[in-house]
Amino acid sequence: MSVPLLEFHQVGFRYPNTPEPVLRDCSFTLEAGRKVALLGLNGSGKSTLFYLAAALYRRDRGEIYCQGQRLVHQPQRLRQWRQRIGLAFQDPEQQLVAATVAEDISYGLCNLGLSPPEVAARLHQTLQEFDLVALADRPLHHLSLGQKRRVALAGVMALAPTLLLLDEPTTYLDYQQRQQLRELLEKIHQQGTTIVIATHDLDFAYGWADWIMILVNGQVSVSDRASHVFGQWPTFAPELGTPTLLGLWQQLPPAWRQHRPFPRTVTEFSRELGERFRHLGDEC
């Protein structure tokens, strides 16, 4: 049996000067290879969970493991931990630290202690993979929000983490930028990286994730296959609303939907409707 990639065991955390903990006895297991959407209402603790997983915050109680290794807040152990878990913040300004795109991506590589030739090689590869070659010498303050997010993500992925955590990656992105993000995440996932996004964007989660986790009152109340969760969505999280495509699918006659998987993309939905209308035409 394989060792889980990430484990939380009864983890608790409370911010200073606040009466109630954000996370309380929070437990879950994450297997490698997943595309996970972490869902929850505002203030449910999604970002806090990420900061704890990335060892930016120290838990008050409980244990956290990555690939079977316990999180210990000692300099050398933290260095190794943070090489395995990469975190991209909701606001890219929080992690862009250099003047230009190339310098920012190189910053983390230099901190790893790589030699100049190794840094140059990894930088060149990352610029190509993230379509940033033309922007390599561009000052960061000249970039759009979408470009800054791409640079921040490139800086994280240049370090080759095993697990990638993305905090609200679709915020303020238009439809085209969201599609570009989806394609980029698919590419990263195909290279072997496990990805978890914390998001309020149900439509993005619905079309992208293969695993759903729902955070309620400081605990992971649901951790299951996306097909199962969305197939019985009102049972799990009615307070979060309903993904648009799922809502449209549920409005169709039950006979249309019987024994058919619900569509996860607009293309799949259109194909299902087209096929059904063709059958109706044949019957007429």
Curated annotation (Swiss-Prot):
Cell compartment(s), UniProt: Cell inner membrane
SMART domains given in the database record: AAA
Catalytic activity, EC: 7.-.-.-
A cellular-component GO term for this protein: ATP-binding cassette (ABC) transporter complex
Keywords of this entry: ATP-binding, Cell inner membrane, Cell membrane, Membrane, Nucleotide-binding, Translocase, Transport
Domain ABC transporter: 6-242
Binding positions for ATP per the UniProt entry: G40, L41, N42, G43, S44, G45, K46, S47
Protein's UniProt keywords contain NADP: no
UniProt key word Nucleotide-binding: yes
Domain of life: Bacteria
Primary localisation category: membrane
GO molecular function, one term: ATP binding
Topology in the lipid bilayer: Peripheral membrane protein
InterPro entries the UniProt entry points to: AAA+_ATPase (IPR003593), ABC_transporter-like_ATP-bd (IPR003439), ABC_transporter-like_CS (IPR017871), ABC_transpr_CbiO/EcfA_su (IPR015856), ECF_ABC_transporter_ATP-bd (IPR050095), P-loop_NTPase (IPR027417)
Any single Pfam family the record assigns to this protein: ABC_tran
Cited function: Probably part of an ABC transporter complex. Responsible for energy coupling to the transport system.
Family: Belongs to the ABC transporter superfamily.
Entry protein name: Putative ABC transporter ATP-binding protein tll2439
Organism encoding this protein: Thermosynechococcus vestitus (strain NIES-2133 / IAM M-273 / BP-1)
